[in-house]
Each structure stands twice: as structure tokens, then as C-alpha cells.
Amino acid sequence: MTWAPDNVRKWSALLLLAIIGTALTAATDPGFVAMISQKGLDFACQQGVVELQKELQAISVPDFSGVFKIKHLGKGSYEFYSMAVDGFHIPNPKIEMLPSDGLRVFIKDASIKINGKWMSRKNFLKAGGNFELSIQGVSISTDLILGSDSSGHITTICSNCDSHIDSVHIKISGSMLGWLIRLFHRKIETSLKNIIYKKICKIVRDSVSSKLQPYLKTLSVITRVDDVTSVDYSLLAPLTTTNQFLEGQLKGEFFWRGHRDPLPIHPPVMRFVPNGAYMVCMGISDYFFNTEVLAYQQSGTLKMTLGGQLLSNNGRFQLNTDFLRTFLPKVAKMFPSMGVQLLISAPVPVHLSIQPSGLSFNPKLETQAFVVLPNASLVPLFVLGMKTNASLEVDAEENRLVGEMKLGSRWLLELKESKFGPFKVEYLEDVINYLVSTLVLPKINERLRRGFPLPLPAGIRFSHFTFYPYQNFLLLEADLHLI
């Protein structure tokens, strides 16, 4: 892409509020920085409240009963039972950032409808029917404190919850004796109001502890990339908020699976002002990319063998000992019409540089050539050093960072070693450049197109994204959607 100038559970959206947030510490710079704007918080709030609404709508209202006494009529009893919430409407949920480390979700003007049955007894008289309870002006305010545990996982607790109900109205139907109930409707309304009031915050707290927090725990901070590497997205410090963004700083470090050694490079300092027009903003440092290269280099997987039919029938060059006759006649004479095998590897890690002009690097490879004897054993011929300049174009697909490597010029060759005497490397320039561009580069880009996972919670994907290259880091700004 071009550089721009400018159904899992819905709780997964609230997870987004926590995944992208930690505080910068003086001791450790992050390899990956992420922020969520107010627009992103609003998106997450809307989706999270949908799930909360389901929980609130499932409120279990217990049966209750009482007695009444009316002058000249004496005592009687009443009972309300089989009550169920018929609707819990939440019109305009809001979310705001608390200073330092939390979020406040508040709901105003919500309403609840409850249907049920009633029964009344007075001496030998018995009556009953249906009722409808309308609860108006329900408000809920809850604080979520975000943090991290010792392993770098996200934690969240509901530190405070308050609720309020403005008014309750009951509508009785089904019997001529309903007027008895209406005489003391305020007492009944108050009793039902208190029951609902006590239930609301309990459900909110239970939802955070039984649904949101376990979901956070399922998000692995060590994300498997492939059979060779994983990436560490653990939090470096407690979660924090500013007045405009929920900010997060993660380790952002690739490593060879099963091997975790100290690295010879360090993350750069990333400073940028996010665009609040997008939901999320991610700063991806050159450290992130370069630890990926280091992991593959340390594992010994940055190599490719070209031989056999791949070389002899490539369509343009038949790379065998007969081909070497021009500059290595001794080889052609000693090993007539035998196959040649090439081993292309990266003896030293490639360092990727990110600048405002884009992502670039200067790969240095090594090619070892062998004669393949009839018994499949190898005879070493020579070693070539190879260097060129290249660029990396990045893109995002769903929840992954993908890329494409492009060569900026022809490979320059240098003879580093020869078992059969020196020769001019110019004889091999065309064939090496052709083989790398047609066989090696497509394999690299095939891996880059598979991509690398970004720290997004389950059920969340990118949309409307753009990239900005800065000095030492790449900025990704995007909106999000649910799948």
C-alpha cells in the first residue's frame, strides 16, 4: 500500500480497553507502543454494554409477600411471584478515562420493565392477576481499574459501583380486587425498587470478575508466530491513562522458541502524537522487526538450499559443472556434467532501518557452492559474498502485520573463498541475480504475506488503517470492527 499523509463475546471489545495500555518506565523502553482514543473507547463501550445489558436483563427477581391493614376492612395479605425482566433498555452508555490507571463507565436514563403475577387474600376472598412494573431513570456508574500481574498479563477489577433509580410505577390488572393492591402501591413499588437496586451492582461486579477478567487471562502475552518464533507482548508496567488516550507499552520482542537469550540491541525511544480521529494507534519500532530477524538468524532458518532439478531445469540457466567450464575449467574436468548445489544464508543479522522515507535495509548474504557427487556427497567449490539494498512495504490484514520485500538493485558479488583457484565473479552475476529474484525472493515474500500477529483481542479486526514512517518506528493508525 502507499504511505498516507494523513460472534465472540462482546466483552472482547472491553478487552481492547486493557490490551493497549501500560506506563513508560525509565528503565525499559518498549518495542511496541499502542494507544486507544476516545473514539476507540466509545466503540468498546458500546459493544461491552451490549453484553452487560444481556446480564442485567437476566436479573432474577425473587418472589415477595406482605400484609396490609385497611381501616374498617381489617388485615389481608398479598404476594408477587413469577417475576421476569421483560426489557432492560440502555440508551446512551458513556466511558471516560480516570487519572492514571482506570476507566469509568456510566449509564443514564436506562429503563426496566418487569412482568409478573400477583395474588391477594382477605378473609375468604382470594384474587389475583398480572402486573407490569416500569422502572425509569436508572443510572449506573462503575470504575474499572486496569493493571498487570507479574507475568505481564492484563488485570482489571471493578473498584466502585453506584446505581440509582428515579421512579417506579406498577400497573395492576386481572381482578376487581386489584384496587386493594393499588391502595398501598407505594410500599410495593419501594420493595421492588430496593430489590432491583441491590441486584444491579452485584451483576456488574460479577460480570467483570466472572467474564471480563477470565477473558483477559485467555489472552496469551507470548504469541506463537510459527514453528520457529514467538513474540512477547507482555506489559512492561502498570496500566495508565492520560486525558486523551489509554496508553500502552509492551515488550514487542520476537524470540526463538525455546531459547531466550539477552539481545545485543535495544528499543529506541518512540515519541509521537496520535490522531484522535482513529480508534487505535500503534507504534512499531525497528527493534520489533530486528528481533524478528535475530530470532530467525539464531535458529539457523535464514538459509535456503538450491539444487537438483531446481537449478538444472530452471528454464534460463542450467547450473551444473558444464556451466562452470568458462571460469572453473578444472571443476568441469574433474566432475563432468554433475549437478551443482547452492546454499544461500545470512551469516550476520540484517538490520532494518525505519526513516520518514520508509523501511529499508542492506542485506548481506553468503552463497556456498558445492558439486553433488553421484553418491550424494558434496564437494565444496567456492563461497560468494552478496550485498544489495532493499525495502520493505508493510500492510495490515485482519489482525496481522504483513509485508513485501523489494530489491532496490542487483546483487553485488565478492569471491570470499575458492577451493579451485580465483575467478571473476562477473561470470556468476546474471545467474545469481536471476536465481535470487525467481526462487529466493518469492519464498521470503510468501512468508511475509502470511504475516505476524498484532496484539488485538479475539473478535477484533482492523479497518480503515494507514501507516506513517518516523525515525526508528512505524506508526499504524486504524479503526476497528467486530467479526
Swiss-Prot record:
C-terminal barrel: annotated segments: 286-457
Glycosylation sites: 375, 389
Gene transcribed to yield this protein: Bpi
Gene Ontology cellular-component annotations: cytoplasm; extracellular space; membrane
Protein name: Bactericidal permeability-increasing protein
Tissue-wise expression: Expressed in testis, epididymis, and bone marrow, as well as in Sertoli and promyelocytic cell lines. Upon stimulation with different TLR ligands, it is strongly expressed in granulocytes and in bone marrow-derived dendritic cells.
Protein task: The cytotoxic action of BPI is limited to many species of Gram-negative bacteria; this specificity may be explained by a strong affinity of the very basic N-terminal half for the negatively charged lipopolysaccharides that are unique to the Gram-negative bacterial outer envelope.
Keyword Membrane part of the UniProt annotation: yes
Record family assignment: Belongs to the BPI/LBP/Plunc superfamily. BPI/LBP family.
Source organism (scientific name): Mus musculus
Domain note: The N-terminal region may be exposed to the interior of the granule, whereas the C-terminal portion may be embedded in the membrane. During phagocytosis and degranulation, proteases may be released and activated and cleave BPI at the junction of the N- and C-terminal portions of the molecule, providing controlled release of the N-terminal antibacterial fragment when bacteria are ingested. The N- and C-terminal barrels adopt an identical fold despite having only 13% of conserved residues.
Keywords: Antibiotic, Antimicrobial, Disulfide bond, Glycoprotein, Immunity, Innate immunity, Membrane, Secreted, Signal
Gene Ontology terms for molecular function: lipid binding
Subcellular location: Secreted; Cytoplasmic granule membrane
Signal peptide segment: 1-27
Coiled coil: none
Domain of life of the organism encoding this protein: Eukaryota
Gene3D superfamilies registered for this protein in UniProt: Bactericidal permeability-increasing protein, domain 1, Bactericidal permeability-increasing protein, domain 2
Induction details: By lipopolysaccharide (LPS) through TRL4-TRIF-dependent pathway. Expression in Sertoli and promyelocytic cells is enhanced several-fold by all-trans retinoic acid.
Region described as Cleavage sites for elastase: spans on this chain: 235-240
